[in-house]
């Protein structure tokens, strides 16, 4: 079960590592996470391993106080499973990920590390890995930065200097 938790476009969220999970490979190098897309409530299926708790804040500012009406809820977790055919797998999930959320270095590192872990490459996760954007990045959610171009094709994004994803020309 998941749903909105807090005031959309009025509240941001601070993500904190669950202390007992701090040594999990996904959390290597992750710190000070803040996301802007508001708050989301989730109740992960069991057996899940919650790595990060999400605390809605009273405003859209990174240093805002916690919303006293909203308790921290799971914000990112893992789950391992075995299918009926016997195949094993594992997933990493986060309730966040709007375009502005990944501008936050800590949160972007969490997502990248989660992808490595999910495909079994946890030994390749380095706390000091460069998680910078490869080219210019245009987050558009909420900030009136413009709309993304329509009709883009993969070849339009081929170069290293291509904006991710280009905005419409005004």
Kindly give the residue locations of the regions a language model identified.
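Extracellular ligand-binding/catalytic regions of CAZymes and related secreted enzymes
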Residues: 59-60, 64-170
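Catalytic beta-strand/loop cores that center a nucleophilic Ser/Cys/Thr
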Residues: 3-86
């Amino acid at each position: 079960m998941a749903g909105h938790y807090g005031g959309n476009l009025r509240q941001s969220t601070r993500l904190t590592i669950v202390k007992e999970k701090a040594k999990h490979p996904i959390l290597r190098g992750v710190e000070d996470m803040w996301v802007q897309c508001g708050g989301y409530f989730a109740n992960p299926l069991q057996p899940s391993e919650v790595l990060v708790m999400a605390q809605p804040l009273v405003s859209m500012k990174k240093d805002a106080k916690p919303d006293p009406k909203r308790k921290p809820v799971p914000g990112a977790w893992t789950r391992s499973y075995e299918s009926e055919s016997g195949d094993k797998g594992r997933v990493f999930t986060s309730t966040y990920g709007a375009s502005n959320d990944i501008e936050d270095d800590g949160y972007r590192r969490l997502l990248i590390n989660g992808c490595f872990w999910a495909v079994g490459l946890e030994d390749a996760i380095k706390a000091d890995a460069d998680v910078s954007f490869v080219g210019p990045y245009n987050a558009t959610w909420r900030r009136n930065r413009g709309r993304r171009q329509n009709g883009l094709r993969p070849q339009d994004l081929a170069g290293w200097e291509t904006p991710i994803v280009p905005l419409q020309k005004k």
